[in-house]
């Protein structure tokens, strides 16, 4: 089930990790491991290659969501996220990124709506690519990240 292309998705949920068996059960693949649980619990298969990512569309909580597992390496995750956000016209505030966090104990969760990448290269890549899209498409718009 794929929603109508442009504007058919309201949210992006991005599960960060590194592709390949070598990284399968490493800390950096916390996002991919979480995606596996979501697949099982929601009965979806994140397996359609699109935007340099494995993707699936789902309706969660009445919202149309694109689930993504970028197939770029962690440091280049923005190369998958930005084109999807642009294609579906999803604003940055509707992008949820699931990643590892070295400052949290396993099993702990933190949700942030503001802040920096905190040294996480995958988040840095996503922020940089999204800012690049904003500056290209809306050169007069000012973006502040605090």
Question: Over which residues does each language-model region extend?
Answer:
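Conserved TIR/SEFIR loop-to-helix hotspot centered on a Trp-containing motif
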Residues: 117
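Nucleotide and nucleotide-moiety/phosphate-recognizing core
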Residues: 2-114, 123-124, 128, 134
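Single conserved hydrophobic/aromatic residue that forms the stacking wall/gate
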Residues: 134-146
